[in-house]
Amino acid sequence: MTTYYNINPRFYVSVDCIIFGFDKGSLKLLLLKRNFEPAKGSWSLMGGFVQDGESVDDAAKRVLAELTGLENVYMEQVGTFGEVDRDPGERVISVAYYALININEYDRNLVQQHNAHWAEINEIPPLVFDHPQMVKQARIMLQKKASSEPIGFNLLPSLFTLFQLQSLYEAIYGEPLDKRNCRKRVADLNYIEKTDKIDKTGSKRGAALYKFNENAYRKAPKFKL
């Protein structure tokens, strides 16, 4: 029996992941070289098709785990990209997500197997299809949300210096922050806690290490840096 569904065209649905990391003062993006056509050998975001019995959210989590080995990662849906000719291979509608990961925690063997590499956000090579638009939109969303919620801590190690914290937000916003004002704002946030540990990698004197107390933040969810 012909049904309403049978008489309408069917499309592929995929997910693409914009994976952000932070290292040495730079916001970075994890990219891979495609090993299949179309656009074989070109730089691309990590993606995959949504499988039977799988939600788009679950598909994005699976794709991220397949590339990095990480689970329970902060992810946010960026939007749906569905131009008719966006993929020259087939009609594919893609749902894009951005993810924030600690760059020291991912599975390097998996990343190597996928021929993936980190690129600095301001030095991204040409990307396939509409992936540049996905990255641009994801970065705008990241900047907006990072200004009002403490999502940036997902990019930092559990213990960090104030220099690292300021460098992170400078990388996210794409502009320098006044050191004095930044330190003053940190002092006003009781959920950024100073520990008794010292980081001596930069100097003999060292720098105090801080941590983000999520429970304290949830009691008074106010953030600005």
Task: Report residues per predicted region.
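Short, His- and charge-rich active-site/binding loops that engage polyanionic ligands
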Residues: 29, 33-34, 40, 47, ...
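Active-site segment of metal-dependent pyrophosphate-handling enzymes
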Residues: 11-15, 58-61, 65-108, 123, ...
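Long, intrinsically disordered, low-complexity Ser/Thr/Pro-rich regulatory/activation regions
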Residues: 196-225
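Short helix-coil junctions and helix-kink-helix linkers
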Residues: 167-176
